[in-house]
Amino acid sequence: ASERKVGESFDKLFMGCDKRIIITTFASNVHRLQQIINVASKYGRKVAITGRSMENVLKVASVLSYMNIPDDVMVDLDKVKKLPHNKTVIISTGSQGEAMSALYRMAFSEHKQIKIDAGDRVIISASAIPGNENTISRVIDELFHKGAEVIYDRNTELHVSGHASQEEQKMMLALVKPKFFIPVHGEYRMLIKHAELGRQMGIAPKNIVIAENGKVIEITKKAIRCEESVTAGAVLVDGSGVGEVGSVV
């Protein structure tokens, strides 16, 4: 799916819906927030935000003009409760089933302002990050228990991966033409595959380094090497007198 397809999916789900719509997505996905606000405005719905991270992102994106929000579309959460359900959209945090996120609290009747009503259409516009499947399933089950219609199936084209495909990685390597290449971020098998891609794109094997946490990388104009290691990982501090710990900690 493409971002255009996601917008089309939103349009279909809003069209003819006479119930309240609650959408959860990644708070950092500014473009997705813009898509939701656009389709809400198209169908005459007011939009409210719940979830601190979502509120902060929307505020900063608006100030920096990264988003175009039509006049009179946004309303406070307290006000949206007083409007007809078919005229409202709530954008919420909690797409990964995080405990104490806005959607989680709504699902388990712990949200102070929003109560899930039978017929509410809940749209999960995000894919599950590996490891979060169980918590997301619990939230979805609770929403169904409360009579909500939950739309989350990956075949509905409600989310697009933010990670580059192999062809996009190839294009980036072709544009940048790096002399040295260090694949980062992801599981080790992913780094191996990315390194193979670099070799396919003409980077000399000796100039490709796969470095695990703690490895020291030395780069000069002519060469790159990775031989030494330093201690790296979680550091747990118990008390204020352990090591060189500043008062801020």
Language-model features, listed with the residues they occupy:
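Acidic/His-rich, metal-assisted hydrolase cores and their charged scaffolds
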Residues: 1-249
